[in-house]
């Protein structure tokens, strides 16, 4: 199943600390060679300051002298930074200062806070730099609680033109993700998105790249947040700039968008058609059992292959860090889609035939279908108990809807071509 594992494709868009949980998830699943994966895990940890975690990977074997020396250096640097930052934090934790930060909503609020600290508490610009260095160091050590608090302070002291402002936004978000504080993580995600959408970057390509990064980080939040899957649909599918970024830089994100759409109770019906179009367009650059399931069902109308793909989807989702928890929802929703499409294609089908396909008695199948229609409000579905049939009404598509859909498709393709041209231009610049 390593064929469908996306860890290597996603890693370039993630911070090292966010890659580590993905490796820890796949290690016991036997997807890759255990020794090589353990070594990769150790190499990643070595690039951070989580030196105790590095030592644990040796499992009682002799620790290299370089690792022991690095541990001493980290402890020394931590103590030096802490001695400098203690006085800074003491000022920032004064009740009146904390209140100003908590109530900071205005665009120029950071300037006013810094002016207040400078005038009333002997605060200096060097202290701001010390705070950022300590925040970054503690994050690298895996102390995400301290990093989160210090980055919160830092974010309230500098303006958006500060060279470390974007790094602070990402660092705060990563800290909350790794602490599994999903409410705070969502707030930080929205702040980061607002900053990126304001486009403070030099080139269009840099903006597209930042959006691709943001969507990868958003998976941690939205697949752990109530109604987060609806927010994935809104961001990944309904916002054209983000959809463009998926198509140009990260088509593998279509897996997560597809699962979000299939399992969404409120947005599935309105989003499936647009999703299938995107999957069809991107089939040449990305496909997996999840996208192939929808292709078989809505483009090929091959129900036997769709059922085969659904079985593969279960294995894919069970080995996916983000999707393993929604496997049950996906299975239930996917079966419903097969049933609904099968009935709609045939318009009229006997309950006896459905019972055979579902491996149920005729009475059980009829009750199951009644529950489906009642629970999911399947449009146009009716049961004729006397004839033992399920009848699906036909929904006509107006000329206006057809024109709108074709216009949307042309717009999508035009924007994608423009981004591909920009990518080609950037590649030429790098080559010269």
Curated annotation (Swiss-Prot):
It comes from the Eukaryota. GO terms for biological process: formation of cytoplasmic translation initiation complex; translational initiation. Residues 221-401 form the PCI domain. The keyword Cytoplasm applies. Its main location: cytoplasm. It is found in: Cytoplasm. GO terms for molecular function: translation initiation factor activity. The keyword Protein biosynthesis applies. Pfam families: eIF3_N, PCI. Keywords: Cytoplasm, Initiation factor, Protein biosynthesis. InterPro entries: eIF3e, eIF3e_N, PCI_dom, WH_DNA-bd_sf. Belongs to the eIF-3 subunit E family. Component of the eukaryotic translation initiation factor 3 (eIF-3) complex, which is involved in protein synthesis of a specialized repertoire of mRNAs and, together with other initiation factors, stimulates binding of mRNA and methionyl-tRNAi to the 40S ribosome. The eIF-3 complex specifically targets and initiates translation of a subset of mRNAs involved in cell proliferation. This is Eukaryotic translation initiation factor 3 subunit E. It comes from Caenorhabditis elegans. The gene is eif-3.E.
């Amino acid at each position: 199943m390593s064929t469908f594992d996306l860890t290597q494709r996603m890693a370039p868009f993630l911070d090292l600390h966010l890659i580590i949980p993905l490796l820890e998830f796949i290690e016991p699943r036997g997807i890759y060679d255990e020794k090589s994966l353990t070594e990769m895990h150790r190499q990643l940890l070595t690039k951070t300051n989580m030196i105790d975690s590095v030592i644990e990977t040796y499992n009682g074997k002799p620790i290299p002298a370089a690792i022991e020396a690095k541990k001493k250096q980290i402890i020394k640097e931590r103590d030096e930074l802490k001695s400098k930052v203690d006085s800074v934090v003491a000022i920032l934790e004064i009740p009146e200062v904390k209140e100003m930060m908590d109530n900071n909503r205005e665009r120029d609020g950071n300037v006013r806070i810094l002016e207040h600290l400078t005038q009333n508490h002997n605060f200096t610009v060097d202290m701001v730099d010390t705070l950022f260095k300590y925040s970054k160091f503690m994050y690298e050590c895996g102390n995400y609680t301290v990093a989160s608090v210090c980055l919160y302070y830092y974010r309230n002291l500098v303006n958006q033109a500060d060279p470390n402002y974007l790094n602070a936004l990402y660092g705060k978000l990563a800290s909350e993700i790794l602490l599994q504080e999903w409410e705070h993580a969502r707030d930080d995600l929205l702040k980061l998105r607002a900053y990126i959408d304001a486009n403070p970057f030099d080139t269009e390509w840099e903006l597209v790249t930042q959006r691709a990064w943001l969507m990868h980080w958003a998976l941690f939040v939205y697949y752990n947040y109530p109604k987060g899957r609806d927010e994935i649909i809104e961001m990944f599918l309904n916002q054209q700039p983000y959809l463009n970024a998926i198509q140009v830089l990260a088509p593998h994100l279509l897996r997560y968008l597809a699962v979000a759409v299939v399992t969404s109770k409120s947005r599935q019906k309105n989003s499936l058609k647009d999703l299938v179009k995107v999957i069809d367009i991107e089939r040449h650059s990305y496909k997996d059992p999840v996208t192939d399931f929808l292709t078989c069902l809505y483009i090929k109308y091959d129900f036997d292959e769709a059922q085969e793909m659904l079985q593969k989807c279960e294995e894919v989702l069970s080995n996916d860090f983000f999707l393993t928890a929604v496997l049950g929802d996906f299975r239930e929703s996917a079966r419903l889609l097969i049933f609904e499409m099968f009935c709609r294609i045939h318009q009229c089908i006997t309950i006896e035939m459905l019972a055979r396909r579902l491996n149920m008695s005729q009475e059980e199948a009829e009750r199951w279908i009644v529950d489906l229609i009642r629970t999911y409000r399947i449009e146009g579905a009716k049961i004729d108990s006397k004839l033992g049939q399920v009848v699906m009404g036909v929904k006509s598509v107006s000329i206006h809807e057809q024109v709108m859909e074709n216009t949307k498709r042309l717009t999508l393709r035009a924007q994608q071509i423009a981004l591909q041209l920009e990518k080609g231009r950037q590649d030429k610049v790098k080559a010269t």
